[in-house]
C-alpha cells in the first residue's frame, strides 16, 4: 500500500529590490531567503510561488490589497503581455532560498516596477 504524508507551510514576503540585473535589462533576479526550504524539501518536496494581484495604492482605499484572505494571486511562472515590453517571471528554489527570475526580449524594467511592493506567497510542501 502507498501512504502519503506531507506538511504544507505558507510564507508571504514583500518584493523589493533586485539582486542582479543584466546590463541590457533583459534578465534579472531576486534571491529571497526562506529557511523553511530545507534539504528534505529540495530532495523530495515542492515549492510553488504566487504573486499578489494587488498592492497598496491599487484601490481608492489605500489599505485594501494587503489582506491575504481577500487577495487574488497569480501562479508563477507568469508571462505578462500587459506591458509595452512583455516579460516572463519564474521561480526556482534551493536549500534555504527561492530565486525569482525575470526575462524579456526588450526590457524587464516595467515588470520590476510592477512587482516592487507586491507580496509573494511561497507554498512549501515537505513529504514525510
Task: Give residue spans per PLM region.
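Short, ordered beta-strand-loop transition motifs
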Residues: 23-27, 90-97
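A structural detector for beta-sheet-dominated domains
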Residues: 14-16, 50-52, 92, 101-103, ...
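Mature extracytoplasmic domains of secretory-pathway proteins
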Residues: 33-91
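Extracellular receptor-binding modules and their adjoining Ser/Thr/Gly/Asp/Asn-rich linkers
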Residues: 2-48
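A generic structural signal for short, non-catalytic loop/turn and secondary-structure boundary residues
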Residues: 4-6, 42, 82, 93, ...
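C-terminal partner/receptor-binding element of secreted or periplasmic proteins
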Residues: 94-128
Amino acid at each position: 500500500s502507498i501512504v502519503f504524508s506531507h506538511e504544507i507551510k505558507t510564507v508571504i514576503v514583500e518584493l523589493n529590490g533586485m539582486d542582479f540585473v543584466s546590463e541590457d535589462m533583459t534578465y534579472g533576479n531576486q534571491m529571497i531567503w526562506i529557511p523553511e526550504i530545507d534539504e528534505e524539501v529540495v530532495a523530495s518536496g515542492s515549492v510553488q510561488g504566487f504573486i499578489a494581484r494587488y498592492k497598496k495604492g491599487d484601490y481608492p482605499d489605500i489599505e485594501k490589497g494587503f489582506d491575504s484572505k481577500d487577495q487574488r494571486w497569480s501562479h508563477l511562472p507568469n508571462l505578462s503581455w500587459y506591458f509595452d515590453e512583455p516579460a516572463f517571471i519564474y521561480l526556482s528554489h534551493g536549500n534555504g532560498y527561492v530565486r525569482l527570475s525575470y526575462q524579456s526580449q526588450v526590457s524587464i524594467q516595467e515588470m520590476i516596477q510592477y512587482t516592487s511592493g507586491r507580496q509573494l506567497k511561497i507554498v512549501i510542501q515537505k513529504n514525510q
